[in-house]
Amino acid sequence: MKSEPDTFGINDLYNKPNQTEHWDGVRNYQARNMMRDDMKLGDLVFFYHSNCDVPGIVGIMEVVKEGYPDFSAFDPDDKHFDPKSDPEHPRWIMVDVKYVKTLSRTITLKELKTHEELADLALVRPGNRLSIMPVSKGQWEFILSLE
């Protein structure tokens, strides 16, 4: 799961009450579908800092609430407002995540791209800009071995 650290970084999650926050504002159907269909209670996910000096994986979170309507889409004063989404027919989904740990070092995008074992990782393939991307069990274990 990607976020810009200037907007919401791993330290922001760490400092939240119960170190938990809803992951709102996702406005891409593919990413929404992953949150709705694939992310399950107890799943561990990487926290990735994007659009910063050193983009990379900085931590781990746990899904503590499965997909439910993203209420930021219903609020006209919210930057994620979507007039075509309403509580009766929500268009957007969010999950709640809990801080698990900050990695001992950032595993940079540049480094991830150098490993043949990660050639199929969506993040390292050209044109993949989704804020949420799948990671296989093998990829997960390999990335953790880099820490």
What are these regions (language model features)?
Residues M1-L41, Q139-W140, E147:
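Compositionally biased, charged N-terminal/linker segments
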Residues K2-E4, Y48, V100, G127, ...:
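Structured loops at beta-to-helix junctions and adjacent beta-edge loops in soluble globular domains
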Residues N11-L13, A73-F74, T108-K110, I143-L146:
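A short secondary-structure junction signal
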Residues D43-F46, V95-V97:
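Hydrophobic/aromatic beta-strand segments within beta-rich folds
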Residues F46-F47, E62:
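Hydrophobic beta-strand signal
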Residues Y48-P55:
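Short, charged beta-turn/beta-strand-edge "cap" motif at the junction between a beta-strand
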Residues G59-L130:
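Aromatic- and Lys/Arg-enriched surface recognition patch
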Residues R129-E147:
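Charged phosphate-binding loop/patch that engages nucleotide di/tri-phosphates or the phosphate backbone
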